[in-house]
Regions:
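Short amphipathic coiled-coil heptad-repeat segments
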Residues: 206-223
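Short arginine-rich
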Residues: 203
Length: 223
């Protein structure tokens, strides 16, 4: 049960609560990054070397994309690819990454970026550090329109404000994201097509796409 503290909060709740689905119902799920760095130190490497795969951290976020590798003291950029580390690896694919933690001073709680399969063609797999969350498809690989659609929803001010109303914490819990309302699958695809066509991704651009979709839906019901 949510209690809006302002008219803006009330509008946000009405807008997001009109969405009919959840991530699992759409065929996706958010999970927590696999590799806990202090438990896996023997497998982590600062340099690529032979037989290593990318290890992605929140520090690799660069706008809405991943910068890799980066120079970051104490944040090894590679994981050795061995039989023992198969449990820490993910197949290459399209993923939506979100930071698990933000500071109180930061404007956005939901900070996400796009990870494309073809970004890492030279590597057999990737890994994600435990301070990240990632959204993957439950069956098969996520398409680009699906990826852009989920990104636009989570990057919007509507979902960010909704999450703040729901939870005052600076931690983004995977279970909470999995229970949030999302547009229908067909709408996710429509949103994704428009987001992918944007000259430059932005929160305002994502908001505009969602608002246009809501306006079209309302007009359709009124006819």
């Amino acid at each position: 049960l949510f209690f809006p503290a302002s008219e803006e909060d009330a509008k946000t709740l009405e807008f997001v609560n009109s969405w009919p689905s959840s991530l699992p119902e759409l065929g996706f799920k958010m999970r927590t990054g696999i590799a806990v760095d202090f438990r896996e130190t023997e497998w982590l490497r600062a340099e690529e070397g032979e037989n290593a795969v990318p290890l992605l951290w929140p520090y690799n976020f660069n706008g809405y994309r991943i910068a890799f590798p980066i120079e970051s003291k104490g944040k090894p950029q590679y994981l050795l690819n061995t039989l023992e580390t198969q449990r820490l690896q993910m197949q290459k694919g399209n993923y939506l990454l979100l930071k698990r933690f933000t500071s109180k001073e930061e404007r956005k709680r939901l900070q996400c970026c796009l990870l494309f399969e073809d970004d890492y063609l030279s590597f057999p797999s990737i890994s994600t550090e435990n301070h990240l969350n990632y959204i993957a498809k439950l069956s098969g690989k996520m398409g680009r329109e699906e990826l852009y659609g989920l990104f636009a929803v989570l990057n919007s001010s509507y979902m960010d404000n909704y999450f703040r109303i729901l939870n005052g914490s600076t931690q983004v819990n995977a279970n909470e994201i999995n229970s949030l309302p999302f547009p229908s699958y067909s709408d996710i695809i429509k949103i994704g097509r428009e987001a992918a066509a944007l000259a430059q991704l932005s929160e305002a651009g994502c908001d505009a796409i969602l608002e246009d979709l809501a306006s079209c839906s309302s007009a359709g019901r009124a006819i």
